[in-house]
Amino acid sequence: GYGQAFTRAISGDWGGKVFEDVMKVTDKLATLEYVDSTRMGAMGWSYGGYMMNWLQGHTKRFKCLASMMGVYDLRSMWGSTEEVWFPNFELEGQPYNSDLYEKWSPSSYIKNFSTPTLVMTGELDYRVPYTQSLQYFTALQTLNIPSRLIVLKYDGHWPSNLKSMPLYYNAHLDWFHRYLGGAPAPWDTEKMVNNEIEY
């Protein structure tokens, strides 16, 4: 089943089994007649955001990605998260005595980056500090990869501010419409960010 043993299997293997599962699901979806395998996108939050950053360096299957509150560099994350016990446990030590920090950091695979990415983060996120997203966005911009960064000023590890949730969803719809097609987002994301429209 999907109990504690299943969850524990991820520890020390951040970009391993989960990545394999994601790609198996992607392969299966690509066989469905109503799925256009040439126009697939992926999004994730927290560890899911980490996985989006990991996908960035390990597959070209997706036309675009969206990473929310995701880990980019495990080494710099170690000294800045409110939960220092978590990387100590998950990565079996500290950056100076465990090779897992480098092995499982998306930042270690920057030379493979190429997929357009929406990056969202909360300035009050102490779990995955928003500087992780700043580092990731800086890397994408330096590589001239189409990317957008939205920092939610009053939010932490989840967009809980009243005005943040509509922006959160609209920004995703806008990004996926831009790269995958389909119906456009209901509002102009740029105007939402600049508080130029009421919503």
Language-model segments: what does each one mean?
Residues G1-Y199:
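Active-site-proximal cap/loop segments of hydrolase catalytic domains
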